[in-house]
Structure formats: structure tokens, C-alpha cells
Amino acid sequence: VLGIKEIFVIRHGIADDATDHNDIDAERQLTKKGREKVKGVVKYLQSRRIRFDIVVSSPLVRARETAEIVNNACSRSRSLAISDLLMPDGSYDELITFLNNIPEEHVAIVGHEPFLSGFVSYCLSRSSMPYVRMKKAGVACITCDDPVVPGDCVLAWLMGPAQMLADE
């Protein structure tokens, strides 16, 4: 019996400019507004009873900070994994192999543009030409048979923080 994997693709929240941290992109942190938006998005996910079995994050600070907020609020296991597969220059196929090798069915991945929109497009169509746009703190939910096969996934929904925070 094929299982279903639900992958929640989450872009990090608003971060400060590289210049605030000696131009080290990897160390850019979420701004106060960025944190607040991520917390609002998390509230929305909670209101929809969305729970993750695992949260996987890019190692860059702004993604990790986003992932920690998501993990603390929406993770069943409080299991936060850090993976270079979600770096801005990651490989879609390697990320899919990773997803196929973990038992968890409800997975949140936290990373960066344009990698994430390319990944969503690749899962839906086998083309990495991004035809979805991920806003900062935006979430895309894609469903796939397990194992995940590029081109065989379905986009369940995609929202930016403005939609998720609309009824606050």
C-alpha cells in the first residue's frame, strides 16, 4: 500500500540586510517583523490543525530561526533537523531522495528562494522552471504518493502570509 506524503514547503521570514552582519549572508537574522509574521503563519497552521512529524531546515540563520518557531508550535515530535540539502544551491533530486528515505509522512521543509519555488515546480511537473512564487513566510502544501516521484505530486494549497494573517 502506497502511503501519502504531505510536504509543507516554507520560506524563511523577513531577514535583515547582509550589511548589518558584515555581509555574511548565512548569518542574516529574522527581523522583529519577520518573527511576528512567522508566528502569525504558525497560528494559522495551528488553527487548521496542521502538525508536522519532522521539520527540516536549511542551516542558514534566517531559515533556522523560522524553523524553530514552526517546530515549537506545530511539530508532533519537536524533531528539528538541519540539512545542507535546503541550502540555496541544493539539488532537487537529492532532497527528494532524502524525503523518500525518512519514514515521516507530514514533513515541513524550511529554506530559500528561488530554490523552494523551483522545488515545488519540479515536484509538480518535473520542470524546475518556477511557476509558483513563495513569499517570505509563505507556505506551499504538496501531496505525493510515497515514494515521492517528480511530476506526480499535487499542489494542495499555496499562501503568502497576507492570506494566512487576513482573519487575525
Q: Which residues does each PLM region occupy?
A:
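Active-site-proximal alpha-helix that buttresses catalytic centers in soluble enzyme cores
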Residues: 2-90, 130, 134
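Generic beta-sheet signal
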Residues: 7, 104-111
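Active-site catalytic microenvironments for nucleophilic, acid-base chemistry
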Residues: 44, 69, 73, 101, ...
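Hydrophobic packing residues within well-ordered alpha-helices of enzyme cores
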Residues: 66-70, 95, 119-120
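Short alpha-helix plus adjacent loop in nuclease-associated cores
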Residues: 87-99
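Domain-level recognition of soluble alpha/beta enzyme cores
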Residues: 127-154, 161
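Short, cationic low-complexity segments
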Residues: 162-168
